[in-house]
Amino acid sequence: MFKGHGGHIKHSTNYRNNGILDFSASINPHGYPENVRKIIFENFDDILHYPDIDCTSLRKYIGQKVGRPEDEIIVGNGSTELFYLIPRALKPAKGIVFQPTFSEFAEALKCSHAEILNNVLKEEEDFCFTYQESYFDDKNVKMVFLCNPNNPTGHLVEKAVILSMVRQHPDITFVIDEAFIDFVEEPEKYSVINETGTMRNLIVVRSLTKFYGFPGLRIGYLAAHADLIIKMMEYKEPWSVNALAQCAAMTALEDKEFISRSREFMFTERLYLFNELSEIQGFSPYKPTANYVFVRINTNDMPSSLLRERLLEHGIAIRDCSNFIGLNDNYFRIAVRTREENIRLISTLKTLLTK
């Protein structure tokens, strides 16, 4: 069975139906746009037919949104399907993953029989990525996965740094995960999606379910040069994106009011949560850039696994980060939720750490 991710609370045997407040999964606390519910009901009978195998309308609309033609877009059953598709189609001998990060990068390389080089970023440098030419000394490295902003640390790599790497290593395919970029202030300083059409070794992958609040529907997309798209489409499963997910994504992307409201809320609320966590003795939160906060525990009395269990006893779930490569039981991650829910979390944490 799949392990090592947040968001399993609804299906947990021990805590089912106990009203757990889930801070373990980083999903928009506003949920989905109201129009998504409406459009799904209106189009529910679409399940009587096969979905559009090419996601034609959705690819065209996504292309318009990100400034790319539709033949440079692939839509998948969540971004994770696309992470597995990329190495399966391009067949790298070796791939680099900068750790700690999303575990499915390494799993995708493993499933394609590529050798994995885990470059663990330094704790004393706050796990920040800095470009080093030595990363690419091994000439068998043909693929690099980089999460921006990184999950779970929240670290951002500037656009110029990424593009410099891509240009200097034209024989390496760089896969940039921008799943949380919609939560970032001034995303144009970090996103490289506009450059995918002119750079034959750059792929940008994005999720449509985290920001728009419907992870149960599973939908994401990638943007890449048309030559790469042709190669990847040879290996992509047909009909992987259902009809309701396609119409939900179209509707969500059109909801400018929801997008604006969600971003403004997140910019304010994550700062509130960061400041409150900073006041708790024994915690050192990292400055958040997306919809989650990465926290270091500075006391030996409450490792992350124990903290997780104690919080579950109070009806709250967090993401224990001890199973991330490069981390230990001094780290956890929490999603940014509503003010009322965040207050409950902070109050419970203070109670637990002062006992």
Task: Walk through the language-model features, giving the residues of each.
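N-terminal "arm"/small-domain region of PLP-dependent enzymes with the aminotransferase-like
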Residues: M1-H49, T130, K139-N140
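PLP-dependent enzyme catalytic core of the Aspartate aminotransferase-like
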Residues: A160, E313-H314, I325-K355
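Short acidic capping loops at alpha-helix termini that bridge into adjacent secondary structure
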Residues: P69-I73, K94, E178, R200-N201
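Conserved PLP-binding catalytic core of the aspartate aminotransferase-like
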Residues: M266-F267, I280-H314
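Short loop-beta-helix segment that forms the pyridoxal 5′-phosphate
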Residues: P51, G63-L85
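Active-site phosphate-binding strand-loop segment of PLP-dependent enzymes
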Residues: E123-V184
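PLP-dependent aminotransferase class I/II
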Residues: Y32-P33, D54, N201-E279, F283-Y286
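PLP-dependent aminotransferase-like
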Residues: R88-L146
